[in-house]
Regions:
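Short, amphipathic alpha-helical "recognition" segments used to contact nucleic acids or chromatin
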Residues: 1-6, 241
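Short, basic interhelical loop/turn and adjoining N-cap
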Residues: 10-27
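RNase H-like nuclease fold core
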Residues: 24-113, 120-125
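Short, polar/flexible loop-turn hinges at active-site or ligand-entry regions and domain interfaces
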Residues: 133-134, 157-161
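Short, surface-exposed amphipathic charged segments that create phosphate/polyanion-binding patches used
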Residues: 147-159
């Protein structure tokens, strides 16, 4: 239990002990939780200066009741022991900066690269606390914005299709005739076509199944704007997945901006404006092709541990266990 996310409930099955009793005894007697030096402020902030490295990741996660915490991890530790650098309550940049200032300045200055999402508060934290570090915006957050823009257009068309179907049913009822919806050659009605096209719009065309390929053909024929939007999203995916140098990526991104301007879609114009604000951070991805996958993976580990506990009753004790598993050496 000191070095792995094992629960007392799991041990109960193998050692025939009462899990509630073991949990209480571990908390009060077997562990050093009651004498833990970080206990007083654990629910506000935890920092582990010895775990800092040259490559960090910063992200936010929800631990209980939807309350967010900012997590800083050492990417070079790959989610193992001593990977946890800091856990701070909330996402307010001032609070996180104050917590990270407990780490000696010499250690903060040795950080060379920090991966983060598109959050302005995270950007401010990195700029203030790690002055010599290169900021790298996660490519998957960038791609997600484009995918969300395509899905937003699809959903808008779907609502219109649902309303159109409702109107047709009402008219058929008033005229005393049976309502027979129009169906495309693959058997989908208009609203079914738009509902069932959700997942294919997330994928590259070469990964479509035969039925998805047929559905996409009909969808793009009926809704040319979706075809254009999907093309913009796909071309951005190709730019980000291509192994190239920063200057070549800059040129490709500029051409993508021109396509967005020509398309005239509001959502993509907003994305382009967002990219412009984070332009250098996005292009820094091409230096080492670093992503925030380490932070996302660590978030998944926290959520899996929380799920195995069936929720968090004592947040301080949960943070103590996280620290024992991921912050201290084994």
């Amino acid at each position: 239990m000191e070095t792995s996310p094992t629960t007392c409930r799991t041990l109960e099955q193998y050692y025939h002990v009462n899990s509630k009793t073991l949990d209480k005894q571990y908390k009060d007697v077997l562990s050093d939780y009651r004498t833990w030096t970080e206990l007083d402020h654990a629910d506000e902030w935890l920092v582990f200066p010895d775990n800092i490295g040259r490559n960090l990741a910063i992200d936010e996660t929800s631990m209980s009741n939807g309350e967010l915490r900012t997590i800083v991890t050492n990417r070079d530790r790959h989610g193992k022991d001593q990977c946890l650098v800091a856990v701070v309550k909330g996402v307010k940049s001032e609070d996180v900066i104050n917590a990270l200032n407990h780490i000696p300045e010499a250690l903060l200055s040795m950080v060379e690269e920090v991966t983060l999402d598109l959050s302005d508060s995270m950007r401010k934290i990195v700029r203030t606390c790690f002055p010599k570090a290169t900021r790298v915006t996660d490519r998957f957050h960038i791609q997600k914005l484009a995918c969300d823009a395509v899905q937003e257009m699809r959903i808008k068309h779907r609502w219109n299709a649902i309303q159109e179907a409702n109107d047709d049913m009402e008219n058929a009822k008033l005229e005393g005739r049976e309502y027979v919806p129009f169906r495309y050659e693959n058997g989908d009605t208009r609203k079914e076509l738009l509902a069932r096209s959700r997942y294919l719009l997330f994928k590259s065309g070469e990964k479509w199944t035969q039925s998805q390929r047929k559905r996409a053909e009909i969808l793009f024929r009926e809704y040319p704007d979706l075809k254009t939007a999907y093309g913009l999203s796909h071309s951005l995916r190709m730019i980000l997945s291509k192994h190239t140098i920063k200057d070549a990526a800059r040129l490709s991104m500029a051409k993508w901006y021109n396509k967005v301007e020509e398309a005239g879609f509001r959502s993509f114009n907003v994305i382009a404006a967002t990219f412009y604000e984070h332009y250098d951070d996005i292009l820094n991805f091409y230096t080492n092709r670093s992503s925030n996958a380490a932070a996302e993976s660590f978030n998944a580990k926290i959520k899996a541990f929380r799920a195995s506990l069936r929720g968090i009753v004592d947040e301080k004790f949960f943070l103590y266990r996280l620290a024992k598993i991921y912050a201290y050496p084994h």
